[in-house]
Amino acid sequence: MAICDITIKKDIAPSCDDPIVPGLEQEGVIMNRADVDFGAVTFNATRKNVIETLALKTGKKGYKVQVFGATPFTGTNTTLATGTYRNTFTNTVNMVVLANDPDVCNDIIDGLANGDFVVVLENKAKGLNKTENPGDSAFQIYGYYQGLKAAEIGNDKYSEETEGGWNISLQETKVPKSALFLYKTSYDATKTLVETLTKPAE
C-alpha cells in the first residue's frame, strides 16, 4: 500500500517576476461529464494535478459559456472541507445566463438543474513569465473528479445583475486536490486544445 505524501515541497513566497493577479477571463467551456472520455485523459508524468489531454467521446462536444462584465464568473472559488480522516475541497463555479426563452430553458437551464458537468475556465493569472512550464496556470478544470452539480439556480425578474436572466451556481464536493490544471507544452497549445473541446470529437 502506497503512503500518500502530505508534506510541502517548496518555499512559501510570492513571485516578484510573475505576481498573481485576481480574476477570470470572460469565456470558458462546459461539458456534460458523461461525455468525457476518461480512458483517453492523460496526466503529466510527475505533476498529477496537471492534465495534458482532455478528450471527449466520439461525436460529443463541449459548449462555450460567456460571462461578460468586470468580474466574470464572480463567486467562483475553492474552499477546504474538513473530514474525519482526510480533508478535501469544494469547488464552486458561478455563471449567469442573460436570456430567458423556451429554447434557453429547455436546452440549458433544465440540463443544468439535473446534470453533472466539467468546466474549464481561464485564469487571468497565467504564469507566462515562469522559467519552467510558462502558462501552466492559465486553464483550470472544475468537476473532473466528482462532477459539478447545481447548488443554486434562480430567475429574478427584477434583478439588476441578470436583468431577468438566470443566476447559476454549480458545486463539486469531496474533491481530493486543491486544483486541477490543463496544460500541454505551452499556453498557445493548451488554448488550441480548449478550443477543440467545442467541436464534435472524432
Question: Model-predicted segments: where are they?
Answer:
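A detector of low-complexity, intrinsically disordered, Ser/Thr/Gly/Pro/Ala-rich segments
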Residues: 5, 44, 129, 194-196
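Generic structural hydrophobic/aromatic packing signal, biased to beta-strands
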Residues: 28, 95, 119-121, 170
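Short, conserved charged micro-motifs
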Residues: 102-110, 180-181
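Mixed-charge, glycine-accented linear interaction segment located at domain edges/termini
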Residues: 141-202
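Generic structural motif
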Residues: 11, 33, 70, 98-102, ...
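Oligomerization/assembly interface segments of phage tail-like spikes and tubes
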Residues: 80-103, 161-177
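Short, acidic/charged, Gly/Pro-enriched secondary-structure junctions
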Residues: 106-140
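Solvent-exposed edge beta-strands and adjacent loop segments
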Residues: 2-94, 146-161
